[in-house]
Every structure is written in C-alpha cells, then in structure tokens.
Amino acid sequence: MNILLVYKEADIATYKMLEGLSKLEDFNIYIASPPIVYRTKKIYGNCTPLDLPVITSKFNWNVIRALREIIKTYRIDLIYSPSSSGLSNALFASIGTRAKNIAYRGTQAKLKRFDPTYYLGILNPAVEHVVCETKDIEEYLSRFIARKRLTTSTKPFDIDWIKEAVRTPKQADDIPDDAFRCIYIGATKNRPFKGLTDLIHAFILLDDPRVHLTIVGEYGENDFQLAQQSKVSAQIHFLGQRSDAISFLVTSQLFILPSHRDASPRVVREAMACSVPCIVTDIPGARDLIIDGVTGLLVPPSSPQKMAASIRSLIDNPERLEAFAKASREHIIQDFSVKAYTDGFATLFRSIKKA
C-alpha cells in the first residue's frame, strides 16, 4: 500500500506514526513537503521524502501539478493531509486517479454548511475519511459527515520527547527555593479564550505569598498590567515566548490550563510527562487528557474562584499532589503510546484501502 503525506510540516507525533508504518511490510510511505522541511529535519524510518513546492493557498497550481505527478509515478493509494491547504490541493491533484483522500481535524472551530470554501476541503464528497483529534470534534462533525467516515485518534506522547528539557531544567528568576511553583505555557496575546485573565484573577484571589506563577508565551498588555497592578505582582513572572518552554515545566509543581476552549493541547501531555499534575478547565477535548482526581483536577471554565480553591487544595495536601505527579507520568506512558497510535492508523488505512 502506497501512502502519501501532504503537509507543510508535520509534527513529531505524525512523523513517528509514519515511521512505524514504514517498517511494516505492506506500507510504503512517501512524504511530500518543501525541501527545506526534510533537509533540516530527520526523516524517520523508511519514509521517502519527495519535493513539493511551498503550499501557499488552497489552490496552488504548482503544488497540484507536482502532487499529480507523484500520485501517478508512485501509484499512490491513500493521501493523508493533516492541513486544510494540503487537503484542498491533494483533492484537486487526485481527480481521476485511484488515490483516496483522508483528512485530519484537530480544531473545534465551527463549520459553515453554506460556505463554499469548506467544500474545497473537509466537506468535499471526495474526502474518504476524517481523523478527529477528540471525541467532541467527531461528535460535531457527525452533523455534516456520516459517522462511518469519522474516526477519533488522539495524538500520542513519548516521554523521550522531553529528555532534553529534563537535562536542562530552568526556573524564572526571583522565585524562592521554597516557593510552590505553578506554570502556564501558551500564546495568549489577542486570544482571550485562552483564559489567562481568569488565571491571574485566581492568583489574586489566592493571595498566598508561598505561591509563584510562571507564564511562558506571548501575552497581551492588559493581562500584564492586571498582574503588575495587583498585590501579587511579585509572584507572577512573565517570560514571553521561549523555545525552551518545556524546561520550565521540569521545575514546576503544578500546571494550570485556564482555557475557555482548546481542542487537545500538547502542553498538558508535556506537563504529565514531566510528572507535573494539571488543573484543567472542564472543556471539550482538554478534559479528556487528564483523569479527574487521579492525575489532576477539572474546574469550570471562567471561574477564578474555583481555580483558586483547587490550587489551594493541592498546596495544602502535598501527599495528594505527589500521588497526582506519579499518576500523571504513568498515564502518559500507558495511555498515550505511539505504538497504539500507529496501530490505529495501520488498521484504518488498511480498511479504507479495501473499501
């Protein structure tokens, strides 16, 4: 079976899945991407890299022409396109060929049935199957797409992916050695749905000199001023965008996700892999990553009061916090296996090929 990945740049979970498939006798894996992608990154397993012009839009003639040549030359059976622009170009390129198109949906953004642009991609009848990141996304898409054409496959996480961060732990300046260290990682500038304002209000309500919060990621001026003008300003540390963000997780005792909506944030997996318990808002997708009362706690979104109370409950119960930390890492190892993720795709691809 000949599988083609079409993407500007896939994440490590997708590459690792393809690596696993490439080692199976019945799979030949081809990765079509701009040369700069695979020349600066390791190509995993027995995957074959193929040149593709940069995808700049949902209809790019040079990309379509190159993809069509690849489809014919390598007798492609299935095309997996994790990005919307890649999917649209692949759909055009595969017209009149035997190649079947498989899409990926990792966002909870709403679809518009009467918006023609969606029929260039995920709502196109030529899309054979859609892989959904979460059950909530699958449930929503079932309003538009037959359930038999939908599958949920949540991305895995391997603890090996945090080895470098573990080797190089970091901590914000001016945090006392005996402080209780909380952390949030995320880009929140112009994204109020990320809930950073709620998290800052929770710390103001908490008003505990023992507790410090490190915020990593691009932030808005309003949130910065809210923290700076509060009585806990010395306990909230804004680091901005950092390429080494995970290294700050390693030295933290609690990760907090205050989002109002967020599909399946990778950072929660990273925290658990680092043995850091999580407080997560009870929202679709994100809530499925933790086990409430075992690896962390769920709190209602937009509720600084409940968030503050949950933080305090873990500060005051170090034994429970330690149990959460241990269970978090075990949860990642047991329930977010790359092998299980790969096996799921192998089964899916085989069934689509036979259909």
Feature annotation, model-predicted:
Residues 306, 313, 320-335, 341-347:
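A short, well-ordered alpha-helix in the C-terminal region of glycosyltransferases
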Residues 32-37, 185-189, 212-224:
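Glycosyltransferase donor-sugar binding loop
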Residues 81-87, 105:
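Short His-centered aromatic/hydrophobic patch
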Residues 12-19, 190-205, 269, 305:
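A conserved mid-protein helix/loop that constitutes part of the nucleotide-sugar donor-binding site
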Residues 292-293, 297-304, 313-319:
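Conserved acidic donor-binding segment of nucleotide-sugar-dependent glycosyltransferases
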Residues 241, 260:
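Aromatic "clamp/platform" in nucleotide-sugar-dependent glycosyltransferases that forms part
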Residues 4-6, 174-194, 200-203:
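Conserved donor-binding/catalytic core segment of Leloir-type glycosyltransferases
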